[in-house]
């Protein structure tokens, strides 16, 4: 199984590691699996599909409809990371068709939960509060992500490994759409702070507007369903984990914030 990925913050100015890890790395793995006739599962991202319009029915959103990504959505990556992930997906598909590689692919929405690197949006804001740093909201905070707890992602991958049809792509999501502004305000509320105690910083370059997953194929064909469907509770549990495991993230914090500061974030 391939879950390879690289943290984005340090690589904005040098995208080559994306190419080497996601393309060359995937090639090495699928060639080894082909040679030794090993079952392979490729973990990918919904970012390969680009982004979707903002929805009218979410607070502060635009004029878009509630469309979602499916396995039939054309690839339209918009960043060095997502373009190389799309390339790695296509390598796997080609090896399945050309060489009979026994493989499946999953494309998942944004994860949250314990052990997530503090560069990422949710743990960054949690550890900012814990470190006495003002949380940072990128741009206006309208960007929407379809959040899924890491335990649900793991259970979905296991379901695909044990029940999935070879050659198929399954999208993993938990119907957890929230905009960044709502998420940061909820974090502050759950941590006993004023929900407006954050500052706006520069938006990310090429920041995709909205991701949303249609996971009906995974649910209907393989019988999977998410267990962590209460985002508020899942976020509270995640906050508690970072509170209780400061030694895991504390040494990284200064470097992460210094790197963000270079980009005005």
Spans of model-derived segments:
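Glycine-rich, flexible loop/turn motifs
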Residues: 8, 14, 65, 71, ...
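NAD(P)-dependent short-chain dehydrogenase/reductase
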Residues: 52-68, 90-162, 175-177, 184-191
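Residues at alpha-helix caps and immediate loop-helix transition turns in enzyme cores, especially N-
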Residues: 14, 25, 117-121, 183, ...
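C-terminal substrate-binding subdomain of Rossmann-fold SDR/epimerase-dehydratase oxidoreductases
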Residues: 129-265
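N-terminal Rossmann-like NAD(P)+-binding domain of SDR-like oxidoreductases, especially those catalyzing
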Residues: 1-111, 236-245, 251, 255-265
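Conserved donor sugar-nucleotide recognition element shared by glycan-biosynthetic enzymes
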Residues: 80, 88, 118, 180, ...
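Structural element of the ATP-grasp superfamily
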Residues: 29, 92, 125, 218-219
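Residues in soluble alpha-helical coiled-coils and helical-bundle/repeat scaffolds
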Residues: 20, 113-117, 226
């Amino acid at each position: 199984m391939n879950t390879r990925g690289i943290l984005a913050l340090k690589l904005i100015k040098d995208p080559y590691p994306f190419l080497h890890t996601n393309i060359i790395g995937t090639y090495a793995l699928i060639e080894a699996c082909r040679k030794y006739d090993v079952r392979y599962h490729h973990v990918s991202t919904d970012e390969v599909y680009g982004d979707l319009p903002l929805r009218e029915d979410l607070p502060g959103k635009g004029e878009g409809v509630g469309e979602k990504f499916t396995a039939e959505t054309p690839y339209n990556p918009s960043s060095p990371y997502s373009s190389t992930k799309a390339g790695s997906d296509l390598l796997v598909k080609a090896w399945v068709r050309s060489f009979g590689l026994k493989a499946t692919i999953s494309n998942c929405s944004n994860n949250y939960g314990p052990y997530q690197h503090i560069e990422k949006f949710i743990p960054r804001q949690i550890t900012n509060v814990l470190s006495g740093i003002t949380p940072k909201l990128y741009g206006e905070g309208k960007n929407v992500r379809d959040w899924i707890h890491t335990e649900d992602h793991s259970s979905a991958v296991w379901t695909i490994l044990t029940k999935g049809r070879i050659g198929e792509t399954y999208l993993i999501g938990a119907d957890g759409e929230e905009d960044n502004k709502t998420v940061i305000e909820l974090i502050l509320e759950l941590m006993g702070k004023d929900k407006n105690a954050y500052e706006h910083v520069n938006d990310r370059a090429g920041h995709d507007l909205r991701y949303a997953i249609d996971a009906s194929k995974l649910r209907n064909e393989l019988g999977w369903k998410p267990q962590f469907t209460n985002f508020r509770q899942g976020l509270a549990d995640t906050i508690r984990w970072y509170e209780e495991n400061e030694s895991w993230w504390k040494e990284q914090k200064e470097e992460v914030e210094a790197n963000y500061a270079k980009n005005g974030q």
